[in-house]
């Protein structure tokens, strides 16, 4: 950029984010009913918005183009920052009960009603562990029936390397061109329409839904425009109040293994979490879940199914899959694959592609196309093995106790006979990182001992910058810059490991990778786990190295 030239789009984006922060932190905006009672406050903000509209700030991206990069920049401006998240948590208000009403309103403003989404023949999947893998398995199975279902949509979160991964057609992320095209169609429709401030007082002109809500809207728009015949939707968080729950008539619903996660939003107990997950159940849409759910959670799921006038069936691991090499590694994936078989069976039968549904029995016969779909499933960052030069990388994102135990057990079983050096690369910036490390350590010990342990941030590059698609505003920037979490992890590791491993701290993923390459001349097995932002950032670093 030339010296003295103003970067107006970035300045405007920064202003809009700070304005949003003021609104969210203001007591009246936190409670819409109070906003309604203060006409002066309403007038002030509407007038401010009018002035900025005159300055062509309503949509600054119109001035600089509508590329994929512009779309990602605009999308990142919709993230809630760390201060806002902490402020909301301090109020103790777990639920945004307006979410679904808002989603209906945002949908109206981009030209759709919820009933329009029924034509997508949706599989709706929730759960704590494995819902993304189950969604990928289901999509891959359906993809084997291309003649009858030429276009299959898949909506998942989070992404690893590129936000486009969240919106896939036939297993592949949509292109940069299509992402930008559909993104700005939604963005511009929202800019050109308004909502009633009496019904939606916080939807001031020019405002947008949050990051995940916007992407959910974008996914519906994309799949309808691309004429997808069936779509698989993974819930973002929970189910009852998740933005994907605007889906009124799914064909079938699935629930993967339940566990404790997102407690601020969903509750502290399995019962509360199960209640939220069961919120996706709909009348007339059968629901399936994996075997060996926590008993208390299963009881609540059954109650929710009865309440919603549908059935809930437990799916046993199919014996026919015992010797099948699934596209996603890990013994625990057999349960997810079995659930995917039942979900796909329901869609294919409803679409008159399968004459008979697959029986929900461990001895059931599974069609060859289903097996091929499970074998061909690709899902980066989950039990992934990569050979890079002399080293072998074992990569599996894990951010809950159960997923960390599963990931660590997978790594232990994969390398227990290996004589190579063992290196751990870990970060988890926003959850109880030390507790996860303790779960990891107890899962691999005493069979596996690490020679070196590296704790890094999720910052992508040595320069201190992030890959654009990996920008995250929901963690404390001060903690990242001061390496507070990483230093705490070092102390904890040295304590539980009795100072046997060499511990290291790096300020970026790129630095961590360079450190690993210089630690030993001999080959090493490297376990990368924790945050999916770490996993995605590492894969981005690998991509740049491969290009060079």
From Swiss-Prot:
Reactions catalysed, as given in the entry: (6S)-5,6,7,8-tetrahydrofolyl-(gamma-L-Glu)(n) + L-glutamate + ATP = (6S)-5,6,7,8-tetrahydrofolyl-(gamma-L-Glu)(n+1) + ADP + phosphate + H(+)
Compartment(s) of residence: Mitochondrion inner membrane; Mitochondrion matrix; Cytoplasm
GO cellular component: cytosol; mitochondrial inner membrane; mitochondrial matrix
Cofactor list: a monovalent cation
Highest taxon listed in the record's lineage: Eukaryota
Family matches, as SUPFAM superfamilies: MurD-like peptide ligases, catalytic domain, MurD-like peptide ligases, peptide-binding domain
Binding site for ATP: 130-133, 382, 396
Binding, Mg(2+) 1: 157, 234
Residues given in the record as Mg(2+) 2 binding sites: 262
MF GO annotations: ATP binding; metal ion binding; tetrahydrofolylpolyglutamate synthase activity
Signal peptide per UniProt: none
GO biological process per UniProt: one-carbon metabolic process
Pathway recorded for this protein: Cofactor biosynthesis; tetrahydrofolylpolyglutamate biosynthesis
Cofactor note: A monovalent cation.
EC number: 6.3.2.17
Keywords of this entry: ATP-binding, Cytoplasm, Ligase, Magnesium, Membrane, Metal-binding, Mitochondrion, Mitochondrion inner membrane, Nucleotide-binding, One-carbon metabolism
Family: Belongs to the folylpolyglutamate synthase family.
Task of the protein: Catalyzes conversion of folates to polyglutamate derivatives allowing concentration of folate compounds in the cell and the intracellular retention of these cofactors, which are important substrates for most of the folate-dependent enzymes that are involved in one-carbon transfer reactions involved in purine, pyrimidine and amino acid synthesis. Required for methionine synthesis and maintenance of intact mitochondrial DNA. Involved in telomere maintenance.
PANTHER family, A to Z: FOLYLPOLYGLUTAMATE SYNTHASE, MITOCHONDRIAL (PTHR11136:SF5), FOLYLPOLYGLUTAMATE SYNTHASE-RELATED (PTHR11136)
Annotated protein name in UniProt: Folylpolyglutamate synthase
Organism of provenance: Saccharomyces cerevisiae (strain AWRI1631)
Organism lineage string: Eukaryota, Fungi, Dikarya, Ascomycota, Saccharomycotina
The gene coding this protein: MET7
């Amino acid at each position: 950029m030339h010296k003295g030239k103003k970067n107006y789009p970035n300045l405007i984006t920064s202003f809009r984010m700070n304005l949003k922060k003021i609104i969210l932190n203001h007591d009246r905006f936190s409670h819409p009913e109070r906003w309604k009672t203060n006409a002066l406050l309403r007038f002030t903000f509407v007038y401010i918005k009018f002035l900025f509209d005159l300055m062509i700030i309503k949509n600054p991206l119109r001035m600089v183009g509508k590329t994929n990069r512009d779309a990602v920049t605009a999308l990142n401006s919709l993230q809630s920052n760390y201060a806002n998240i902490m402020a909301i948590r301090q109020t103790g208000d777990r639920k945004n009960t307006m979410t679904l009403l808002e989603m209906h309103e945002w949908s109206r403003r981009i030209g759709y009603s919820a009933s329009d989404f029924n034509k997508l023949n949706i599989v709706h999947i929730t759960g704590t562990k494995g819902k993304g893998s189950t969604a990928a398995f289901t999509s891959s199975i359906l993809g084997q029936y291309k003649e009858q279902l030429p276009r299959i949509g898949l909506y998942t979160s989070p992404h690893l390397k590129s936000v486009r991964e969240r919106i896939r057609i036939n297993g592949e992320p949509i292109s940069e061109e299509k992402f930008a095209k559909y993104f700005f169609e939604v963005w511009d429709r929202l800019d050109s329409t308004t909502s009633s401030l009496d019904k939606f007082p916080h939807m001031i002109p020019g405002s947008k839904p949050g990051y995940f809500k916007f992407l959910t809207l974008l996914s519906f728009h994309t799949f309808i425009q691309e004429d997808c015949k069936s779509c698989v939707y993974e819930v973002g968080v929970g189910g009852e109040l998740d933005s994907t729950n605007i889906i009124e008539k799914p064909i079938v619903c699935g629930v993967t293994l339940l566990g404790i996660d997102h407690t601020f939003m969903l509750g502290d107990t399995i019962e509360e979490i199960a209640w939220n997950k069961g919120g996706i159940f709909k009348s007339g849409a059968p629901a399936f879940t994996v075997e060996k759910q926590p008993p208390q959670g299963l009881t609540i799921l059954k109650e929710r199914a009865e309440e919603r006038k549908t059935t809930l069936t437990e799916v046993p691991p199919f014996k026919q899959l015992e010797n099948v090499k699934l596209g996603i590694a890990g013994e625990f994936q057999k349960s997810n694959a079995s659930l995917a078989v039942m979900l796909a069976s329901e869609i294919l039968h409803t679409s008159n592609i399968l004459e008979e549904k697959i029986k929900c029995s461990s001895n059931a016969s599974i069609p060859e196309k289903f097996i091929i779909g499970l074998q061909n499933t690709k899902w980066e960052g989950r039990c992934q093995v990569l050979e890079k030069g002399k080293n072998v990388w074992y990569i599996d994102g894990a951010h809950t106790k159960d997923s960390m135990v599963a990931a660590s057990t997978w790594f232990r079983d994969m390398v227990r006979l290996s004589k190579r050096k063992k290196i751990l690369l870990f970060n988890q910036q926003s959850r109880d990182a030390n507790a996860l490390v303790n779960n990891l350590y107890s899962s691999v010990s005493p069979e596996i001992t690490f020679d070196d342990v590296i704790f890094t941030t999720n910052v992508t590059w040595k320069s201190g910058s992030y890959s654009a698609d990996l920008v995250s505003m929901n963690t404390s920037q001060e903690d990242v810059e001061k390496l507070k979490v990483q230093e705490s992890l070092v102390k904890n590791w040295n304590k539980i490991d009795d100072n046997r491993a060499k511990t290291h701290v790096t300020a970026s993923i790129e630095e961590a990778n360079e450190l690993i390459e210089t630690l030993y001349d001999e080959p090493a097995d490297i376990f990368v786990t924790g945050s999916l932002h770490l996993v995605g950032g590492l894969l981005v670093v690998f991509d740049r190295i491969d290009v060079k």
